[in-house]
Amino acid sequence: METSVVRQTLAVLHPAGIIDNKAVELYNYINNVNEYTIVVPDADVLSCVCGTNDNNLKLIENHLGTPVFTRGNELSVNTDDSSVRQEFQYIIDRIVDEINDGSRNTGDIIASVLNIERRADVEQTSILVPGALRKIYPRTQNQADYIMSMRRHDMVFCYGAAGSGKTFLAVAEALRLLLSRQKSKMIISRPVVEAGESLGFLPGDLQDKLNPYLRPFYDAMEMIIPRETVKRLVEAGAIEIAPLAYMRGRTLNNSVIILDEAQNTTVEQMKMFLTRMGEGAKVFVAGDITQTDLPKRVQSGLVHAANLLSSIKEIGMNRLTAEDVVRNPLVKKIVKAYENEQNESE
């Protein structure tokens, strides 16, 4: 029986839209055939996978150490090495998943997939929020480690460059915990007195004054779940977005709590925030120690806490660098230049 006939007879539809031919793999093994084939039914998706002039396939070939062949809507490798076959399947699955979720920059997708070390725990780092617009994948090894840290620890600090995903991933993981009913409330906070501005002198009511500071949280959530869902959760009180000063005197139980722009907290404010943690709570603290707006002689609460609490094994400490920046590629170069200057001055 020809392989194509076996494939047509025994193909199993993969949830991501790939026909994953496990039956064909068994047939090939029994008949000592080395070809491992994945069928991508959608021609547009296949074109994105291959890339312009098959540039993406060349990257995959270099990574696998074996040629990748295309025939119609099929991608194949000729190898009897099960680890290579599994890696090939994993890479194509990931690319197709992200394309189906709306991503079209497959060069970035492939770079992120190939740069992340494939370990059993890393494969569990995608974030699937119930009712989400798309699945969230880590783009770098550091991001994957950050997600694992949020899963393993009840308190996690992450400091890193602008655009490295520290806040977005924390918001995504918090939404997952909330919408899967593992936590009853999601609270997001940040210090609101920045760059010399004081709320009392800004125009409008309290909400008008807070919106410019808290808008990034809404932007992040609306990239993950529909805007109507965000609005409904906020109105129901399941999601609370508030300035840091509103945390004083509270005990937050069974909640997931995010403190963003933590570099702009004082030592006293950081202590106040961390001690709000109640039973069943998770706390994610994110900030960029290179962008503090505090007066020069005021120590950052983030820097102080990262040093003071680093020996407590129950607290996760993560750092993201310029290599983890996922905004415009030019941003990565800018961040790298500032990092280099800071390292030279230290």
Residue ranges and their predicted role:
Residues L133-L259, Q263-E346:
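Conserved helicase motor core of SF1/SF2 NTP-dependent helicases
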Residues V24-Y90:
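Accessory, non-ATPase domains that flank or precede helicase/AAA+ motor cores in DNA-metabolism machines
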Residues L26-I30, I110-S126, Q342-E346:
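Intrinsically disordered, low-complexity linkers and terminal tails enriched in Pro/Gly
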Residues F69-E123:
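Interdomain "pre-motor" coupling segment immediately N-terminal to P-loop NTPase/helicase cores
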Residues N31-P41, I95-I110, G316, L320:
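Interdomain boundary/hinge elements
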Residues M1-N31:
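N-terminal amphipathic/basic-hydrophobic helices that include classical n-h-c signal peptides
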Residues E123-K135:
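Conserved adenine-nucleotide phosphate-binding loops and their immediately adjacent elements
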